[in-house]
């Protein structure tokens, strides 16, 4: 945050931290307002006010799916990027535990990933934390070398939230597909900044968060 200092107090704020969060756009506020006021129905209910909310929810799902070239059935709304990361790592680990209990990630992931991996280690999972080089990057070769017969998940951040490095997600995804290992990327800092298509990037799970691109917090 940068402040313009006046004689009496710091009165004017210039915000320069959009990597942390963004101001909600006026267009988003206008689109949401009817559903915070008169059209406040529960989208899971069968009566009209709930059905109206459900229709708008599905329209939103279609919009998000289109930006990723994904199917609407592949879009899940959570309370934010951290829950999305938790959901991906813990659920894939649980679903694939009969196949193996080895996970590959990096040492520069968001705490939502690192904490989930630490939790799984307490349950008996083995986690390999790849170290980045001097430029803050990991290489596809590192990923390949870390893969074991019992590896069931690879999770690598798309764009780092502190230093801004962009990892080789396409190449890592290709390796994961060849080895039939599920691949998750935390794209919270990349979505809406870098063109993303699940038809191009070979990812199985991708996390994003609306408050990083002028949307509401908690989505």
Q: Which stretches of residues belong to each language-model region?
A:
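Pyridoxal 5′-phosphate
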Residues: 2-219
């Amino acid at each position: 945050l940068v402040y313009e200092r006046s004689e009496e107090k710091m009165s004017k704020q210039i915000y320069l931290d959009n990597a942390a969060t963004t101001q909600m756009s006026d267009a988003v506020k206008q689109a949401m307002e009817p559903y915070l006021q008169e059209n406040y129905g529960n989208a899971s209910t069968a009566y009209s006010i709930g059905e109206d909310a459900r229709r708008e929810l599905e329209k939103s799902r279609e919009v998000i799916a289109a930006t990723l070239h994904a199917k609407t059935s592949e879009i899940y709304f959570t309370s934010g990027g951290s829950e999305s990361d938790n959901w991906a790592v813990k659920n894939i680990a649980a679903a694939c535990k009969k196949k193996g209990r080895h996970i590959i990630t990096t040492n520069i992931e968001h705490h939502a990933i690192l904490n989930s991996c630490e939790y799984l280690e307490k349950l008996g999972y083995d986690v390999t934390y790849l170290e980045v080089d001097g430029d803050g990057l990991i290489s596809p070769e590192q990923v390949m070398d870390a893969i074991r017969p019992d590896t069931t998940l690879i999770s690598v951040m798309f764009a780092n939230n502190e230093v801004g490095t962009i990892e080789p997600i396409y190449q890592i995804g290709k390796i994961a597909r060849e080895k039939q290992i599920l691949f998750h990327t935390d794209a919270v800092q990349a979505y809406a900044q870098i063109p993303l298509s699940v038809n191009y990037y070979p990812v199985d799970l991708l996390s994003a968060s609306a408050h990083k691109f002028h949307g509401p917090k908690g989505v």
